[in-house]
UniProtKB/Swiss-Prot annotation:
Belongs to the eukaryotic ribosomal protein eS4 family. InterPro entries: Rib_uL2_dom2, Ribosomal_eS4, Ribosomal_eS4_central_region, Ribosomal_eS4_central_sf, Ribosomal_eS4_N, S4_RNA-bd, S4_RNA-bd_sf. One of its GO terms (cellular component) is cytosolic small ribosomal subunit. It comes from Pyrobaculum arsenaticum (strain DSM 13514 / JCM 11321 / PZ6). This is Small ribosomal subunit protein eS4. It comes from the Archaea. GO terms for molecular function: rRNA binding; structural constituent of ribosome.
Length: 238
């Protein structure tokens, strides 16, 4: 089924609930889950407003005018999510999907120099042939690394990934003192210094504390992403 009822769409989608018909585009299976992604058609029509209708949005996508993470996507239902880089080919505009305190996820304009850079959170590691380690990231991407590099990078760490050259540019460990941003939950979009980690048996449910000035927020480890040692390594805020 390629559509779903508007009333059942994630609450943060920027669509009218009682206007525009009963149905809305449903994201196709892809790198991000349904609850935390937007189909390209809605990005084009309702967020960027390059189209007035779904038909116009489908045409724009089908012409190959939209790149996601450096790859032309022609599926109007393709799901875009956290930290994805969206490029409008004819205009050269580049956007990053970032956590936002008002809109949950929002498109942030970024310089073209950052079009090939993406933050990826490590969700797990496995050993493959030859003793090398394969890293698994939040967007479904996998990367095989040398044993030495793989040993340094832990689950919940973040890497700055070069989409064009498919290489790791920076490794940001999940540790006290780093700058992190909340990616899910009621505190989504808040960023600050990680000053506390209360480890629990289920590591993903460990309680963490972030501080920015006098403001303090608490959430769980599974809901944050490290974005820099002293400051974010790429643009994630206006």
């Amino acid at each position: 089924m390629v559509h779903l009822r508007r009333s059942l769409a994630p609450y943060w989608w920027p669509i009218p609930r009682k206007a525009g018909g009963v149905w809305v585009v449903k994201p196709s299976p892809g790198p991000h889950s349904f609850a935390y992604s937007l189909p390209l058609a809605i990005v084009i029509r309702d967020v960027l407003r390059y189209a007035k209708t779904l038909r116009e949005a489908r045409y724009i996508v089908s012409r190959g005018y939209i790149k996601v993470d450096g790859v032309v996507r022609k599926d109007y239902r393709f799901p875009v999510g956290l930290m994805d880089v969206i490029e409008i080919v004819p205009t050269g505009e580049v956007y990053r999907v970032v956590p936002d305190q008002d809109r949950y996820y929002n498109l942030l304009p970024i310089p073209s120099s950052e079009a090939s850079l993406k933050l990826l959170r490590v969700e797990g590691k496995t050993t493959v042939n030859g003793g090398r380690l394969q890293l698994h990231f939040h967007d479904g991407r996998n990367l095989i690394t040398s044993p030495d590099m793989g040993a340094k990078i832990k689950t919940f760490d973040t890497i700055l990934y070069d989409l064009e050259n498919k290489t790791i540019k920076t490794h940001i460990p999940m540790k006290l003192g780093v700058v992190a941003v909340v990616t899910h939950g009621s505190n989504v979009g808040f960023s600050g210094k990680l000053y506390e980690i209360v480890w629990t048996l289920k590591r993903r449910q460990s309680v963490v504390g972030l501080k920015k000035g006098e403001e303090v927020r608490r959430t769980i480890l599974d809901y944050i992403m490290a974005v820099g040692e002293e400051s974010p390594v790429i643009k994630i805020t206006p």
